[in-house]
């Protein structure tokens, strides 16, 4: 009887071990098979894929998730992709993130810090050619202004806010000879360099990136105005992703710099820091104020 009980116990233990082995293998297979789509809007004419590739590869290696990138051409498309469930993770500008948080269940979780900088914030610059007759910010009245794209934070929203401070508006025909959207920060700057615009409003990140890759030389231009600090363009994920997976993705992004060279929105990054939704309340107030002033 004792031998019979021992055999039964051994059989039970073997079956239990087998069950746990199967469950463990199944759990691992599930984790490895999880796939997420990441959407981004190129910040420049350079394409930007290389800025994201290294970071994504490291995140994939750490989490064992598969991340597929989707490039779209405008900010609204990036929001719509997450709202419709076609994208799970996104690189957004600050203003676009506010919209995505409102209608697409987006949640900001990280932002890149550029090499040599102390935080992830950046600025909107107003740039003119070196020999321009525009000497101070108020001199832009009556001139040709180029901006990035409608919906851009540092290439549309913040320039409008800064102009409002000196009682100018892009929608008032008396304030500018013309205002046009060039389609990217790079194109906005090139419009000035090629005499298509007198002044451009653009991201400080793209200004520095194009200076670094010799698209232009510092002596060709002047910065006539710099905005207050702008909250950084965040990486955001959909709240529809299970919490445990969101935590894995966030932790991997925050640790990524330890595993190799990484990039992000606007070029090379030294590392990523944690951000939260309330960090963008200042932009929400700016958007509300601008709407109020226009109404």
Where in the sequence are the language-model features?
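Short, Lys/Arg-enriched N-terminal segments with co-localized hydrophobic residues
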Residues: 1-9
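Short helices/loops that flank or line small-molecule/ion binding pockets
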Residues: 76-90, 103, 121-122, 138, ...
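Ligand-binding clefts/hinges and TM-proximal coupling segments of bilobed small-molecule sensing domains
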Residues: 66, 144-162, 251-295
């Amino acid at each position: 009887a004792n031998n019979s009980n021992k055999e039964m116990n051994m059989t039970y233990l073997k079956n239990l071990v087998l069950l746990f082995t199967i469950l463990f293998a199944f759990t691992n297979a599930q984790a490895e098979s999880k796939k997420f789509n990441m959407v981004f809007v190129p910040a420049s004419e350079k394409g930007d894929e290389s800025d994201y590739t290294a970071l994504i590869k490291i995140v994939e290696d750490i989490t064992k998730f598969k991340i597929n990138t989707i490039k779209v051409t405008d900010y609204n498309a990036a929001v719509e992709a997450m709202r419709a469930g076609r994208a799970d993770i996104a690189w957004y500008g600050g203003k676009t993130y506010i919209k995505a948080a409102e209608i697409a269940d987006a949640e900001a979780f990280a932002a890149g810090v550029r090499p040599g900088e102390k935080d992830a914030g950046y600025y909107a610059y107003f740039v003119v050619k070196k020999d321009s007759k525009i000497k101070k910010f108020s001199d832009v009245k009556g001139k040709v202004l180029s901006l990035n794209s409608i919906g851009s934070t540092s290439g549309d929203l913040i320039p409008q806010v800064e102009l409002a401070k000196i009682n100018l508006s892009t929608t008032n025909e008396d304030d500018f000879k013309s205002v046009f959207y060039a389609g990217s920060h790079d194109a906005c700057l090139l419009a000035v360099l090629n005499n298509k615009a007198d002044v451009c409003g653009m991201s400080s990140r793209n200004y520095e990136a194009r200076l670094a890759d010799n698209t232009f030389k510092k002596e060709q231009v002047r910065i006539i105005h710099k905005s207050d600090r702008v909250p950084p363009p965040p990486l955001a994920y959909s709240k529809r992703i299970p919490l445990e997976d969101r935590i894995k993705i966030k932790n991997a992004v925050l640790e990524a710099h330890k595993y190799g060279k990484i990039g992000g929105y606007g070029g090379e990054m030294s590392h990523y820091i944690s951000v939260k939704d309330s960090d963008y309340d200042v932009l929400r107030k700016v958007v509300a104020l601008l709407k109020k002033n226009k109404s």
